[in-house]
Amino acid sequence: MIMKITLMSYNTQHCLNYVTRKIDFDIMADTIKRCGADIIGFQEMRDQSQDPAYEAQAKIIAEKLGYHYYYFAEAIRFAGVNPYGNALISRYPILSAETVRIPDPDPRKYDGYYETRCLLKATIDVGSGLHVLVSHFGLNPDEQENAVETVVSHIPADRCVLMGDFNMKPDNPILQPVMQKLCDTAQYFPSPKLSFPSDSPRVKIDYIFVSSDVNVCCADIPEIVSSDHRPHVVTIEWE
């Protein structure tokens, strides 16, 4: 039997409505519905804490979609208590999920902003199984090198999707080890697309990669202004 599903990568800027500058779960859920996504990998998501501004954002959006499966991968705790990281929401059961820490550069080589990052690694119960990786890379080259090394070491042998905001343009040589292992679905765009900022994008830093044993039916970055990033969407199929 051929399985066909739609995946979406989305940096939500902690579910901040780009126009109103307020937390807006409805517009995030509506964006997912408009894209018809079955599995969504998020970056810049909050989770529950004592601070009322920190809610279980993946759970809230999943409930608005009527999806029953979600996972939050904590990368950092702001102020030591407020969890922040990546998340996954799925129409299909999540068989397993784990949070893999990306090592911080030590020592730091640059003067820019540094932040601890992580890789969300999950297996979804769809068809014969699908491995999904979600990450948000740092801004500095040494952070990005550590992220690429971590991701490449966790790419499984079959049926894999890697998605996220990698803070790198496609021609960045640091990204090449990923390009060599997986297929960049941007080649299936109907025309070249950029992803950030959402109202007038100047760069493409958001990605969905797939392994060679899945077929890409279509891919796009829709012109949607909800978060500060546009969503990246791909439909794949496999037997």
Predicted regions span which residues?
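Active-site regions of metal-assisted phosphoester/phosphodiester hydrolases
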Residues: 1-39, 63-64, 69-73, 79-239
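Active-site neighborhood of divalent metal-dependent phosphoester/pyrophosphate hydrolases
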Residues: 43-50
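Glycine-rich loop at the start of a catalytic domain that most often binds anionic cofactors/ligands
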Residues: 54-55, 88
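Phosphate-coordination/substrate-recognition cap region in phosphate-metabolizing enzymes
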Residues: 57-61
